């Protein structure tokens, strides 16, 4: 497994599943250049998904033209209640990728988006989606089976501890390390660990704040985050979503600096942590997460843990672009990004109703004002998931 995986959710022409005659030559020419550079640089792993619009179809038309004997092909299919529907989607992916024509298989098949216990049940129940995947595996049409997840830590651990999967795709970056126990659990089971979208979900590092650029110097924030992630025990590969060949450049710089990670990372980490402490204080950093109800148990389904995390990122490192995108997605992300933002406060949710569920939080008195400031700074823009846009 290479250190970087070429992610297939940035290079495609469209997020809608366009027919082949509508795929433009310019889009295919761009993708071919990306594939050729990826092969030349050792990015042998390609990761796409059934619902990445035209991604699978475009890849299927080009993989035979850009040969790579070391290629590892991964696609992802979401779990559903009806396993026949799951198998139909799997067949469609294999067809779009034109595997039979090349005598190839899906090397890595992910059950895509096990984000709650209901979806885990659809996957694991007798006769469910996992059994379909395992049948394809026994027939030689699938190599290894894993899962991708945006779930809460407890649910990720539950899925890992089933011992049903060979690898996991999850979120873990410098700005978000709460899934560390999941990585440890995966290591204990000799599972592969794939980090999802470290550049985008790691803080919009493609458009970093001036503050973050200053704190990460002399490295670009992308390079710093890549080095941090790749230096972590148990992390095997990072997704690199490229819209053009040059999008590989900073990530390849990180690879070249990996032997110096122990020298380069500590001073940057010290500056980042000092900035957090100066902006927020140790009391907040040590205790802000304590006593917060989960979003289903909060009036208006306000996702307090996530919103207060965004507040911390905003105050410490000015991650406004990232914060605005995450804030706007709350309420529109379904099980991929559950809960709601603070817009309901003072509207359908009163301060008294909110305080009633914050009895165990040491910051109960401050939280309503924090949410109002966050709403003022980040609100006003509804955001949809890329597939919805």
Predicted regions and their residues:
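A cross-family glycoside hydrolase active-site/sugar-binding cleft signature
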Residues: 5-9, 47-49, 74-76, 109-112, ...
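Short hydrophobic/aromatic-enriched beta-strand-loop microsegments
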Residues: 70-73, 164-172, 259-265
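N-terminal binding-site loop/beta-alpha segment at the start of enzyme catalytic domains
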Residues: 1-71, 357-389
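Alpha-helix-loop-beta-strand connector modules within alpha/beta enzyme cores
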Residues: 56-75, 129-140, 195
């Amino acid at each position: 497994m290479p250190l970087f995986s070429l992610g297939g959710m940035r290079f495609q022409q469209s997020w809608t599943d366009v027919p082949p005659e509508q795929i433009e030559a310019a889009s295919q020419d761009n993708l071919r250049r990306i594939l050729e550079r990826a092969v030349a640089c050792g990015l042998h792993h390609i990761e796409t998904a059934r619902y990445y619009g035209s991604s699978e179809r475009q890849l299927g038309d080009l993989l035979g033209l850009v040969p790579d004997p070391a290629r590892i092909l991964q696609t992802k299919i979401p779990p559903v209640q009806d396993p026949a529907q799951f198998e139909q989607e799997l067949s469609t992916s294999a067809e779009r990728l034109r595997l039979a024509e090349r005598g190839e298989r899906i090397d890595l098949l992910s059950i895509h988006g096990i984000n709650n216990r209901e979806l885990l049940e659809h996957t694991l129940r007798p006769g469910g989606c996992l059994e379909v995947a395992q049948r394809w595996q026994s027939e030689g049409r699938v190599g290894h089976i894993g899962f991708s997840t945006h779930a809460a830590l407890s649910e990720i651990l539950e899925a890992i501890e089933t011992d049903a999967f060979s690898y996991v795709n999850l979120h873990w970056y410098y700005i978000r390390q709460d899934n560390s126990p999941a990585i440890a659990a995966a290591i204990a089971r000799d599972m592969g660990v794939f980090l999802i979208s470290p550049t985008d979900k790691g803080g919009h590092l493609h458009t970093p704040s001036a503050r973050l650029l200053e704190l990460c110097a002399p490295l670009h924030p992308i390079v710093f985050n890549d080095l941090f992630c790749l230096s972590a025990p148990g992390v095997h590969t990072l997704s690199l979503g490229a819209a053009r060949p040059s999008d590989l450049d900073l990530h390849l710089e990180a690879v070249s600096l990996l032997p110096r990670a122990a020298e380069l990372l500590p001073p940057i980490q010290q500056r980042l942590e000092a900035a957090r402490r100066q902006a927020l204080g140790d009391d907040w950093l040590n205790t802000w997460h304590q006593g917060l109800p989960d979003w289903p148990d909060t009036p208006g389904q306000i996702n307090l843990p996530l919103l207060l995390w965004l507040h911390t990122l905003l105050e410490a490192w000015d991650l406004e672009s990232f914060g605005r995108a995450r804030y706007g997605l709350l309420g529109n992300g379904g099980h991929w990004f559950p809960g709601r933002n603070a817009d309901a406060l003072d509207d359908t949710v009163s301060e008294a109703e909110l305080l009633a569920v914050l009895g165990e939080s040491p910051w109960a008195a401050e939280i309503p004002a924090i949410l109002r400031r966050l709403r003022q700074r980040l609100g006003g823009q509804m955001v949809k998931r890329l597939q919805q846009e």
